[in-house]
């Protein structure tokens, strides 16, 4: 409400209120006695407000004609009453006469237009306020209750103090709280409108009676002041006499508000604790309570100590009771709390707050100290009993050592109940067994030796998957191949796929065990075959004793063949049964012998020939254990000092000795395996792209210059010079496709020929009476006349024989070629097909089959074209 300061002339004294017969005499007395004070000039009167509400309800409910009549009567009454009051009151009473408030003026202005003034304009608090401060819920409910009271029950000073009081602690409220309070205010205004509509009929009757009374009392209004003025004067007198009572009431009201705000804050904290307890475990809620205990004020602590009950429970009973209450309690939701607060009346809210306070004092405090160590021991004891009884999942598969480790960890390693719960979950899932001993963090391996390297991020080895199946025997995995087996296989098969071992054979002479007696001279063919068969003996180091017998293999063909002299000397040693004419019989074949396979010579190898691709490996002077020891010591020294030159030298020497030792154990040999080359078979070679498909078929075609294609492109909106496609980003030149999808009806430019003269009837009659096509060329080919084959030569370049044969028959107007399957033999994986083609009454059949039918038809068509002379002979 607006506050205006006025002089004491505007204040009514008891003398002025009591005697009205002689006002001019008492006016100076009042001015001298009462000092000037500050008062509230504009204050809502209860009777005026009730009248305003009645007028608004009547305006909304009555018809338009009744509204106009009532408004006219009301305006007439107001004018008459104003005139009577002005005529009856004297000049000195003008200072005492109450001025019309702004609310009354607004009500009269809106009454002319048959409308009710908005509540925002009737509220005088909005003119003086700079910031809109939200009140507490209880303040709003109390305000609503006071507005519903009868006239004169609420003092103006209390209402003014309530509006004037601003709390700075409400500045921390966020926007969501403000929105909720706006919604509540909107709902309350709707409820008020609903109440006004329900009381419409009652207020209508009251207004009619009041109008009759006004017409009767308009003559007596000039003689005596109304009761309204008396009450106004009394209230002003009380406010002037007792200015100190307002400050006391204001302070008392502020204290009550502060106390209510503390209770509301404490209630919100309890709701938050309940929400945390419902979501988290027991001890999480306990920790939260311990944190909040230190931050509360001293008054809250004393209040909580008074509220504690004398009933003492054991820690286990309290834990079970809290657990049961958490299970029964519904999860907190602020959405439902807001709806409940809107639906509850203010009286009920006040009553519930008192009962809630009393109920809270009877209940046990949530900050009650609980012996956590005792609860931890109880939980640990229960877990150990379950582990010993075997009821915990995963215990049956543990060994005795693992069980002992688990028991030790459960007895002495657990910190909280949550740790024990997590550890039991790990045991049931099989994940906790690897965490019993932290081997990856220690610097000692399983054997007790110091680790060379420490890996801080080393991954654990993946454990094998174990499936528990009843009545099943476990499959024993095959043992891995040992190093001895691998070494034996390497010694037996020393050569790999040929990448490391190259074919550089060196023949080493070997002394024969027994001197072999050479056989007599053999025929040349037999000699050649014998020498070819004896070559494996040379491979296995069984050389022929005579070196001269192998020398002719490396001489040129034109050279003279030297007869070995040893043969002549050994001829007498042959038994006499052999006829002497044997050398004469063997003399005629004097053709120089050239073996099909060159025979390696057994002559001593020169130093140039002894060059080997394998390095000469000298055996190391130390054993493997000393090499490894030297390498480990070098590694340790390098870890301490990476710039140690001696350690680097030792490392290099050990590495070189290790590689030389490994190479010495590697024995090279001849390649006896397979190169791994996958030679394709005939049917595999014939599969894939066919012969008549070219790689540049889609790129080296002719551009579109006209015809139907160009017409369609231009019809679709394409212009020469633009790119193809929707976004015009394609090729600038459209190309013709060189693929014929249909053999009939298509004519190319090469096939067009000028019109020919009609052949004579005799020639047309004898056109098809020629001899067999396969026997020789056709008459047209021989030049008998301008036949079809002679006039337009066929283009066979880059064309399939089947297509060429089809074009030939279509040009000569013959029957199309007929292909018939003549042969289909062979296994399922390697079939052999043979086709024959019939053209103009002649049949052509190739002499060999093919792996597929397309190739067989191709061979038949090619044979037909070769016989006609179109294709060159193969």
Swiss-Prot record:
Compositional bias (Polar residues): 12-24
Any Pfam family hit: dsrm
Keyword annotations of the record: Nucleus, RNA-binding
Organism classification: Eukaryota, Metazoa, Ecdysozoa, Arthropoda, Hexapoda
Expressing tissues: Expressed in ovarian nurse cells (at protein level).
Composition bias type Basic and acidic residues, residue spans: 176-219, 226-277
GO CC terms of this entry: nucleus
PANTHER family with a match to the protein in the record: PROTEIN SON (PTHR46528:SF1)
InterPro entries assigned to the protein according to its UniProt record, in alphabetical order: dsRBD_dom, G_patch_dom, SON
Disordered, as annotated region: 1-45, 68-98, 120-368
The DRBM domain, residue ranges: 800-870
A GO molecular function held by the record: RNA binding
Bias type Low complexity, positions: 70-89
Protein name per its UniProtKB record: Protein Son
One Gene Ontology biological process: regulation of cell cycle
Biased composition, class Basic residues, residue ranges: 128-147, 162-175
Family annotation (PROSITE patterns): DS_RBD, G_PATCH
Chief location bin: nucleus
Protein location: Nucleus
Domain G-patch span(s) in chain numbering: 705-751
Reported phenotype of the disruption mutant: Results in a progressing reduction in egg laying accompanied by a decrease in number of germline stem cells (GSCs). In the ovaries, results in an increase of Rga pre-mRNA. Results in a decrease in the levels and stability of mRNA and INE-1-containing pre-RNA. Might reduce levels of DIP1 sumoylation. RNAi-mediated knockdown in the germline results in loss of GSCs.
Gene giving rise to this polypeptide: Son
Function description: RNA-binding protein that protects nascent transcripts containing intronic transposable sequences, known as INE-1, from being degraded by DIP1. Modulates DIP1 activity by repressing its sumoylation levels. This ensures that intronic sequences will be degradated only after splicing. In the ovaries, regulates germline stem cells (GSCs) self-renewal by repressing the expression of the GSC differentiation-promoting factor Rga.
Keyword RNA-binding: yes
């Amino acid at each position: 409400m607006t506050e205006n300061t006025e002089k004491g002339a505007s204040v009514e004294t008891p003398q002025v209120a009591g005697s009205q017969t002689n006002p001019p005499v008492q006016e100076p007395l009042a001015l001298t006695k009462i000092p000037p004070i500050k008062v509230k000039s504009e204050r809502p009167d209860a009777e005026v407000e009730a009248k305003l509400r009645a007028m608004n309800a009547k305006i909304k409910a009555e018809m338009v004609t009744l509204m106009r009549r009532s408004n006219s009567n009301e305006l007439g009454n107001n004018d008459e009453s104003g005139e009577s009051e002005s005529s009856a009151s004297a000049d000195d009473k003008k200072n005492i006469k109450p001025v019309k408030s702004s609310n009354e003026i607004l009500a009269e202005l809106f009454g002319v237009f048959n409308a009710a003034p908005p509540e925002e304009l009737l509220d005088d608090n909005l003119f003086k306020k700079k910031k809109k401060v939200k009140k507490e819920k209880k303040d709003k409910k109390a305000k609503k209750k006071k507005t519903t009271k009868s006239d004169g029950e609420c003092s103006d000073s209390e209402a003014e103090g309530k509006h004037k009081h601003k709390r700075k602690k409400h500045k921390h409220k966020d926007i969501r709280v403000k929105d909720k309070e706006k919604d509540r205010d909107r709902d309350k205004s709707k409820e008020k409108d609903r109440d006004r509509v329900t009381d419409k009929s009652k207020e209508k009757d009251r207004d009619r009676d009041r109008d009759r009374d006004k017409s009767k009392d308009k003559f007596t209004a000039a003689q005596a002041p109304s009761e309204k003025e008396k009450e106004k004067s009394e209230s002003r007198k009380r406010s002037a006499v007792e200015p100190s009572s307002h400050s006391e009431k204001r302070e008392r009201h502020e204290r009550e508000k502060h106390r209510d705000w503390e209770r509301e804050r404490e209630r919100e904290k309890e709701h938050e604790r309940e929400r945390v307890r419902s979501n988290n475990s027991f001890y999480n809620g306990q920790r939260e309570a311990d944190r909040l205990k230190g931050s509360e004020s001293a008054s809250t602590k004393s209040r909580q100590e008074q509220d504690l009950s004398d009933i003492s429970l054991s820690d286990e009973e309290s834990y079970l009771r809290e657990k049961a209450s958490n299970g029964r309690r519904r999860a907190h939701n602020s959405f439902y709390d807001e709806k409940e607060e809107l639906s509850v009346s203010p009286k009920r809210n006040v009553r519930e707050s008192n009962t809630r306070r009393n109920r809270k004092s009877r209940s046990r405090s949530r900050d009650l100290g609980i012996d956590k160590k005792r609860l931890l021991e109880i939980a640990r004891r229960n877990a150990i009993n379950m582990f010993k009884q075997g009821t915990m999942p995963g215990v049956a598969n543990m060994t005795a050592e693992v069980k002992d480790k688990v028991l030790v960890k459960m007895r002495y390693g657990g910190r909280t109940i949550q740790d024990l719960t997590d550890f039991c979950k790990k045991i049931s899932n099989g994940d906790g067994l690897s965490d019993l001993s932290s081997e990856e963090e220690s610097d000692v391996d399983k054997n007790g030796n110091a680790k060379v390297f420490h890996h801080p991020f080393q991954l654990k080895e993946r454990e094998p998957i174990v499936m528990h199946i009843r009545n099943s025997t476990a499959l024993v995995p095959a043992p891995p191949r040992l190093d001895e087996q691998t070494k034996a296989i390497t010694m037996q098969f020393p050569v790999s796929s040929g990448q490391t071992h190259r074919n550089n054979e060196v023949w080493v002479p070997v002394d024969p065990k027994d001197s072999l007696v050479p056989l007599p001279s053999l025929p040349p063919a037999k000699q050649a075959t014998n020498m070819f068969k004896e070559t494996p003996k040379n491979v296995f180091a069984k050389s022929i004793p005579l070196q001269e017998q192998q020398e002719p293999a490396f001489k040129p063909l034109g050279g003279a063949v030297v007869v070995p002299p040893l043969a002549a000397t050994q001829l007498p040693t042959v038994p006499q049964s052999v006829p002497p004419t044997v050398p004469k019989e063997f003399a005629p074949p004097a053709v120089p012998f050239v073996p099909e396979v060159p025979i390696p010579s057994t002559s001593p190898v020169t130093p140039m020939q002894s060059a080997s691709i394998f390095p000469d490996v000298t055996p190391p002077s130390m054993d493997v254990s000393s090499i490894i020891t030297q390498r480990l010591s070098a590694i340790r020294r390098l870890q301490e000092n990476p710039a140690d030159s001696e350690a680097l030298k030792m490392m290099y020497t050990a590495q070189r000795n290790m590689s030389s030792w490994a190479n010495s154990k590697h024995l090279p040999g001849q390649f006896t395996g397979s190169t791994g080359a996958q030679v394709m078979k005939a049917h595999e070679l014939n599969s894939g792209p066919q012969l008549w498909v070219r790689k540049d078929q889609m790129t080296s075609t002719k551009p579109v210059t006209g015809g139907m294609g160009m017409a369609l492109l231009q019809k679709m909106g394409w212009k020469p010079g633009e790119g193809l496609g929707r976004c015009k980003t394609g090729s600038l030149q459209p190309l013709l496709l060189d693929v014929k999808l249909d053999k009939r009806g298509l004519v190319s430019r090469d096939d067009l020929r000028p019109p020919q003269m009609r052949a004579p009837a005799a020639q047309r009659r004898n056109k098809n009476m020629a001899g067999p096509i396969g026997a020789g060329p056709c008459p047209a080919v021989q030049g008998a006349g301008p036949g079809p084959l002679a006039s337009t030569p066929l283009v066979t370049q880059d064309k399939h024989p089947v297509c060429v044969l089809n074009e030939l028959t279509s040009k000569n107007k013959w029957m199309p070629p007929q292909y018939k399957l003549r042969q289909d033999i062979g296994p399922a994986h390697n079939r052999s097909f043979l086709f024959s083609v019939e053209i103009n009454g002649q049949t052509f059949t190739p002499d060999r089959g093919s792996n597929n039918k397309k190739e067989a038809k191709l061979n038949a068509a090619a044979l037909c074209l070769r016989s006609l002379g179109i294709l060159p002979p193969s």
